[in-house]
Amino acid sequence: MTERVNALDIIDLTAAYGRIEVLHGVTFSVPRGAVVALLGPNGAGKTTTLNCIAGVLNPTGGHIHINGHHLNGSASDRLARAGLCTIPEGRGIFPNLSVQENVSLFSFAATAPPKEIEERTYTQFPRLGERRSQLAGRLSGGEQQMLAMARALSTDPALLLLDELSMGLAPKIVEDLYEIVGDIGRQGVSVLVVEQFARRALAVAQLGIVMVHGRVTAMGEPADIADELSAAYLGGAA
């Protein structure tokens, strides 16, 4: 029987900014088709971990495997071929392009025809369909986050990385966005969401990972990490 390969395996990952080591042997996995929440207070090392996975920062040690491929410090095109797509904290949309142009921008990397991608996008994100000719820079913060997600999904990713999905958004918008994240997971896309505010992320995640000071301190189903998560936030992180 063939062993099931995880969407992501992080093994003994270390990273540094200059001479300051900020990740200390980080190890965890994202199973295929799962939504996983990477949690912890500000400065815990969550975004640094994400940047190592996304190829933005070269780790100083350890291993990153995406769908079974060893991809430490790989170029973005190689990561994309492995099925990885990242939505950074700043969302990465093009404000002077229309919603439609933003959605179409990455469709070259998809296996489906452009028309099918368009129909699928506006079915999943009807609010964007109503604004498809509008400049992306004129959308609300929540709509811009939806656009970033829609554009990422247009590439048919196997693994989606989300950084601070709720940053600067109203609670109702955050709730709507996480409902979409849950839907994405149910469609078979693996999702790793980095989040400082844990409650909403854990509502849709099958697995939660707690980080403090560059180390994983707890990992498990959301109900099983509650005490460690509380301790992480009460203790804080520099």
What are these regions (language model features)?
Residues G18, S74-S76, V99-E116, Q124-G129, ...:
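ABC-type ATPase nucleotide-binding domains, specifically the catalytic core motifs of the NBD
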Residues L39-P41:
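The feature captures the beta-strand-to-loop junction immediately N-terminal to the Walker
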Residues A54:
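Helix-to-loop junction immediately C-terminal to a conserved catalytic motif
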Residues G62-L71, A82, P114-E116, R120-T123, ...:
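Conserved ABC transporter NBD signature motif
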Residues L135-L139, E143:
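Conserved ABC ATPase signature
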Residues A152-L153:
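ABC ATPase C-loop
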